[in-house]
Amino acid sequence: MAFSSSIFSVTQFSSSLASRPSSAISRQTRFPAQIASPDLSPALFDDRRKFVGGVMSLLTKSIKNRVYASINSIDSAATPSYPKSEDDDDVVPMPMVMIDQDADPEATIVQLSFGNRLGALIDTMRALKDLGLDVIKGTVSTEGSIKQTKFSITKRDTGRKVEDPDLLEQIRLTIINNLLKYHPECSEQLAMGETFGIKAPEKKIDVDIATHIHVKEDGPKRSLLVIETADRPGLVVEMIKVMADVNIDVESAEIDTEGLVAKDKFHVSYQGQALNRSLSQVLVNCLRYFLRRPETDIDSY
């Protein structure tokens, strides 16, 4: 009789647990002394086999009830829950477009990423073909939560990589335009979003703070010009015009766009030679003035 009443009390505990899982597991966890231990005296059983069987049966039911309580309890200490942020899925990743001229001697590498939201990019490849380019290879890789797509492209008429800086800028703007078209949520993270997107960027980059210009040695025949500044439509073409005004030749360019920031590299020369120190300083000053020109023009009046 004592054993039967013990089984009954556990069953009742399970029943009350189903109706009130939170309070039941709280009582069990916080106040274990309040739960009476069942009477398992061997004298209540006819033989040793019945005793062992009774204990195992009770133990099994107890374990099942505890597992059931852990699954259904909302404040169980054994199974803590970690609330997921409501806007985890609403965070818009940073769009990135990189045009690499050094990775492959035969082709221009275009790499773009937008978290894990990019698809097959069929329309982007079609748009590149409209520029007279051939996509000879495409690869997709994943690093953590970021999906990166790479295209190897060449000029259709020559079969060689793209060297013309104007065409490189067209490639960049074409890709960004497709991003804005098929992923309009990225508009507030791109400079072109202010003109062509559904929502202009909320955060404005201070041009004075963001602008860094350096000229480095890159052999006797050319120099490496590195520019980091706030991005804007047509930036590369305009910078090349500034260089042409001081008779600097642009041999090739690498163009990277990381959200609102442009990070560009140009291989430049003057009359077939690398830039000396004084000419490098003239170039840096001209570019710095051009990049700050909107504010300078206003202040000059």
Swiss-Prot record:
Chain segment of the transit peptide: 1-57
Superkingdom as given in the UniProt entry: Eukaryota
Keyword terms of this UniProt record: Chloroplast, Plastid, Repeat, Transit peptide
PROSITE patterns: ACT
Protein name: ACT domain-containing protein ACR12
Gene expressing this chain: ACR12
Function: May be involved in feedback regulation of amino acid metabolism.
Chain ranges of the ACT domain: 109-189, 224-294
Organism: Arabidopsis thaliana
Family matches, as InterPro entries: ACR1-12 (IPR040217), ACT-like_dom_sf (IPR045865), ACT_dom (IPR002912)
Alphabetized PANTHER family for the sequence: ACT DOMAIN-CONTAINING PROTEIN ACR12 (PTHR31096:SF60), ACT DOMAIN-CONTAINING PROTEIN ACR4-RELATED (PTHR31096)
Locations listed in the record: Plastid, Chloroplast
A GO term from the CC aspect: plasma membrane
